[in-house]
A protein has these predicted regions:
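Short His-centered aromatic/hydrophobic patch
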Residues: 85-91
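A short, well-ordered alpha-helix in the C-terminal region of glycosyltransferases
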Residues: 221, 248, 328, 335, ...
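Conserved donor-binding/catalytic core segment of Leloir-type glycosyltransferases
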Residues: 138, 179, 187-203, 209-212
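Nucleotide-activated donor-binding/catalytic signature segment of Leloir-type glycosyltransferases, i.e.
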Residues: 234-261, 269
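Donor nucleotide-sugar binding/catalytic pocket of nucleotide-sugar-dependent glycosyltransferases
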Residues: 108, 124, 129-176, 187, ...
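Short hydrophobic beta-strand element within catalytic cores of glycosyltransferases
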Residues: 271, 290, 294-295, 299-302, ...
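Acidic donor-binding loop of glycosyltransferase active sites
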Residues: 248, 254, 265-283, 298
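Conserved acidic donor-binding segment of nucleotide-sugar-dependent glycosyltransferases
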Residues: 313-327, 335-341
């Protein structure tokens, strides 16, 4: 049986999409040891897992000699014969040392940031080295594959495999407690647009705030719930004040993972009009939040950035918009708020799609095949 060493900078209790991606898959692997950075609350989190987590002394792991020695020692001590890099860059550079130490099979998974790296000459060479040193490089969707192919050698291009995330539809579901959230936030009688994301410019919360005055003119009882935290919060609060919509906006701040389903469920529409920035370096890899919203039964409004369109069936589960176009964002949100029947139908279609095509069990089975070398 394959025993896998997972080497990753991205792991709970640190919050984030990649962290959730890696944890959900690790929790479904048969025999696994995780090597991850230190983080506040890690001891309590690790004790609750059904697999071993070994923490690096610091909160960041880079492909240094120290990290390499620790990873090699762990591989040997635990008898691991496979390695999964939860994010290919930059820790995938450890592959040769782990191969020499006995790793028979090495898989490196890419996300949105590797698609950005593929645009930069030096970073592109790093990706090329990683691709040549591992057995498989995985990608999220067609957009990220296209970006990666331009960075990888012909040999590595032939070893690209899709590994998409899943959604726990028993966790993200309609009726998950949204009424309580709306009541607690003073939104019980409002039609709520919800956005769940880290507060950074690429995610488009600023465009939602600029769209809100026009939304309110068409739907006076609308409100915007911005869930999450991040470095852009003060700027977003200033925009809300400048647009004179602060009374119709709620900033939740950080929300515990266990409380996320209720916050999705507090909305009638999910909107995150993400946009590509920095000449393609800052781009949406996929946008699992759209799938979590769909699982909750919400119609979605997504930005056309990177792989985000892979998480929406246009016209069936939601709308795709230019994330910079305030009028387009306004129009999609208003259309959904003013036609509850259509919005409900889109939400139902989205949940059915996620239940059929986006399960964690299927993703974990795929990863297991890749780690064993049995994928076809």
């Amino acid at each position: 049986m394959t025993r896998t060493l997972v080497v990753t900078n991205d792991f709970p209790p640190r919050a984030g999409g990649i962290q959730s991606f890696v944890h959900e898959l690790v929790a479904r692997l048969d025999d696994v040891v995780v090597y991850a950075p230190a983080w506040e609350g890690a001891a309590t989190f690790d004790d609750a897992q059904n697999f071993e987590v070994v923490r690096h002394p610091s909160s960041l792991m880079l492909p240094t000699r120290s990290v390499s020695r620790r990873a090699v020692a762990l591989l040997k001590a635990r008898g691991c014969d496979a390695v999964w890099f939860g994010a290919a860059a930059p820790l995938g550079l450890l592959a040769p040392a782990l191969r020499a130490a006995g790793a028979r099979r090495i898989v490196a998974t890419t996300h949105g940031h590797e698609a950005g790296w593929a645009q930069l000459p030096v970073a592109r060479q790093t990706l090329r080295r990683i691709g040549d040193q591992v057995d498989v490089v995985t990608y999220l969707g067609q957009y990220t594959r296209g970006r990666l192919e331009r960075a990888l050698s012909a040999s590595a291009q032939g070893r690209l495999e899709r590994l998409a995330p899943g959604v726990d539809t028993s966790f993200f579901k309609p009726g998950a407690g949204g009424d309580v959230v709306r009541h607690d936030l003073g939104l019980a009688d409002r039609r709520v647009i919800v956005c769940v994301s880290r507060l950074v410019p690429r995610k488009g919360q600023d465009v939602l705030l600029r769209a809100l005055p026009a939304v309110l003119r068409s739907v006076p009882d609308a409100a915007l719930l911005i869930v999450g935290d991040g470095p852009d919060r003060k700027r977003l609060e200033a925009i809300a004040d400048r647009e004179a919509v602060r009374a119709a906006v709620r900033f939740s701040g950080p929300v515990a993972w266990a409380d996320l389903p209720a916050h999705y469920d507090a909305g009638q529409v999910f909107a995150m009009p993400c946009r590509t920035r920095r000449r393609g370096l800052d781009v949406e890899g996929l946008g699992i939040v759209y799938l979590e919203a769909s699982a909750t039964g919400l119609p979605v409004v997504a930005g056309r950035s990177g792989g985000a369109p892979d998480a929406v069936i246009l016209g069936e589960t939601g709308h795709l918009v230019d994330g910079r176009d305030v009028a387009a964002v306004t129009g999609s949100i208003v259309a959904l708020l003013r036609d509850p029947a259509a919005a409900t139908a889109m939400g139902a279609a989205g949940r059915a799609w996620v239940e059929q095509d986006w399960t964690w069990d299927a993703a974990a089975a795929r990863l297991t095949e890749l780690l064993r070398g049995t994928a076809v």
